[in-house]
Amino acid sequence: YIFEYIPNKYSVTEENLRSSDAIEIKIGQGTKPGMGGHLPGKKVTPEIAALRGKKPGEDVQSPSKFPELNSREDLKAMVAMLRERSGGRPIGIKIAAGHLEQDLEYCVFAEPDFITIDGRGGSTGSSPFFLREATTVPTIYALSRARKYLDAVHSDISLVITGGLRVSPDFAKALAMGADAVAIGTAALIAAACQQYRICGSGLCPVGIATQDPALRARFKMEAAAQRVANFLNVSRAELETFARVTGHHSVHDLSTADLITLNRDIARYTGIAHAGTPKL
């Protein structure tokens, strides 16, 4: 699993850092860029309070930034510190898709193993609607710009893209546009049990995922949900293999923009993907 290293530093222990497969420094999130978080006291159960070092029933405020990060040198030092503390685990940096080139300059200087970019199109149960619908760069343009920047500076840092990617065709297109990997959130929740009631923040999720209510949580069958997520991922992998075959490739990582077309003139203009009306000679 990927351990998310956030400003509040919840659950940051040597054991957790070293038992993770990778560590991701969360600088930003696509659906609420530049914001922290607020967990109302009514959701802070004894279990959550113990994990977060708070009192049960006490509001938990998450800061919007790491107080120790004020320069690119600070970010580089944090990457090095986590790499050492974790025993050499891969270290990533997650940013919201905003001032991409400027932010990527800082990230590349910090020398992480991967950079995750979260574009508009993603979701979370706790982001304000007005921000979710009006901020950050749409994922397709964010990916294109990021790939161009990393190529221009000859960086070999892996690029992970997320934000609204739901099914295997989305994943295949993202890989073709230059992503090394894709990350999902909502798609996995839907595979598990989510029926998109869109009331996550209320704590009254009727399928038992986003709630601390014992009666509602009892409705969530974890083993069955885990199997559904595994099925979704396995089917997605098989479908990605099919996309590779039908385009004449041995691997999905051989896909490129040459394998894509679009009906959208703006996408064609800004991403280099050919318009469907343009002859390929």
Please tell me what each predicted stretch does:
Residues 36, 45-51, 57-58, 63-66, ...:
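Generic secondary-structure boundary/loop-capping signal
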Residues 4-21, 141-149, 207-219, 279-281:
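Short, basic, helix/turn surface patches
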Residues 49, 53-56, 71, 205, ...:
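Short capping/connector residues at structural and topological boundaries
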Residues 1-81, 85-92, 96-108:
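Active-site-facing alpha/beta catalytic cores
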Residues 14-32, 150-153, 157-162, 166, ...:
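Electropositive, surface-exposed helix/loop patches at the edges of structured domains
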Residues 61-217:
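Glycine-rich phosphate/ribose-binding loops and adjacent secondary-structure elements
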